[in-house]
Each structure stands twice: as C-alpha cells, then as structure tokens.
Amino acid sequence: MPTLLLRLAGAMQSWGTTSRFDQRDTGKEPSKSGVIGLLAAALGIDRENWTDLEPLTRLSMGVRHDRAGIPKYDYQTVGQGTEEIVNSDGNVQIRSRMILANGKYPSGDHLGEGVQSYRHYLADASFLVALEGEDRSLMERTHAALRDPVWPLALGRKSYVPSESIWIENGLQDAPLRDVLARWPWIGSQRKWEEPPEKLLVSFESEDGSGVLKMDQPLSSFAERRFGSRFVRSEWIPLPHEVPHVPA
C-alpha cells in the first residue's frame, strides 16, 4: 500500500487532545486528529464536511521523532484592570479597561477580572509523519495538495507555522509505513554543536490493542468534535544511514 510522508518541523508546535478552557495541552508527538485536520486544510475540506473527511480518518499513521523538541508553555492573560473616571457630576467612578462585545463595560462582581491561560507547546521539534492507505488516488491528491494547499497549514495552532515545507518531493512511497520510516533520511537539521542521535523513537498504530490508548481518532466532522480511541505502540529504531538533509 502507498505511504504518504509529511515533514512537521517548526519553532513551535502543539498537538493537544485534552485541552479545556484556560489549559491548552500538547502531546509529545502529532495527534491523529491534528494531522487529519492539517490534510483537510490542504484539501479544502470544510469543518462540517464529514463525507470527504471520513476517508482520511481511515489512514494508518506512524510518527518518527527526529527531534523530540523541548516542552514549554506560554503564560497569557486576557485582562481588564481598572481606571478612575470622573463623571460629569464630579464623582469618581471605577471602570474596567476592557469593553465587552456588546459595547458595554463589565460591572459588579466581574469588575477588574482577567483570564489567565497556560498554552503548552513543543519548541524546536521535527517529526516525520507517515500515513498508509489503500486508496492511491486519495494519497496522490493529498500529496499534491500539501504542495499547493487550499488553506494555510499550521502545526496544531494557527500561529504555529512550519519552518520547512510539510510537502516532501518524493513523499509518496510504494512501501509499507514501517519500512518507509525505517529507511527515510533523518530530517532533523544538523548543527555544528551536536551529533545526530544513534536511535529514533517511532510510534505505530497497534492492531492488537497493545500500547498506549489515545483519544484522537476522528469520528465526525471537526464541527461536531467527536473522537474515538486508538492504541499506539512505540519502539526505537537505528538512525538511517543517509543523514544529510536539505530543506525542500
């Protein structure tokens, strides 16, 4: 079966599956829901369109950690604060600095309140993602769309842009997913002060129910946001011999 490769490299990327309210998490590797969403953006599949999205969700996914990245987080505030306003009658009024969507100022118990948010991400990470499926026509269209996407592509969040092309020139391979990940050249940028790793961590979808349970298998359109489970097993493989990497 054909295998499609994606290069996910950037200064910041985030692949959350359990984010709630003011806590935005990230996993240690790209989530399947996030990768499928990226493909949907490339193909121009709308958030309400399950018919065209569903074939993508049937692809098997593997991830190779060419550069694991450094877990970090941003502390953000969406705030108000207050200011003193002198009314026409000369009285001093305490007023919020923030204006609500309805054009009014917060008052009462909500005066001066602010929202704190913790947004976790991976810094300086590079992943080689492989997707395997039987529909070669779908794989070819998706590969072409990654080169000329309908909508902008991002690494988990709209502001997290890739530092290299997600599209890989020879990224559609007629070989099993495992074989492609085992032999494809390392995509971590070489730096003068560091040596390439001797081994790379890879994750595969498990068919026998072993491994780690992840709740990132899309079951509906992204507008409905329903996700199911899948099992993922990880192992270490030797670094492929062809190490030099030139961005596409």
Each model region followed by its residue ranges:
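Internal, well-folded beta-alpha domain core
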Residues: 66-248
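Hydrophobic residues positioned within well-ordered beta-strands of beta-sheet architectures
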Residues: 4, 61, 127-129
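Pocket-edge structural micro-motifs
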Residues: 8-10, 65
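Short N-terminal binding/cap micro-motifs at the start of the first secondary-structure element
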Residues: 12-18
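Sparse, context-dependent recognition of short Cys/His-centered cofactor- or disulfide-binding micro-motifs
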Residues: 6, 14, 24, 30, ...
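N-terminal start-of-chain detector that recognizes signal peptides
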Residues: 11-12, 32-37, 99-105
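Glycine/small-residue-rich interface belts in oligomeric ring/scaffold proteins
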Residues: 2, 18-90
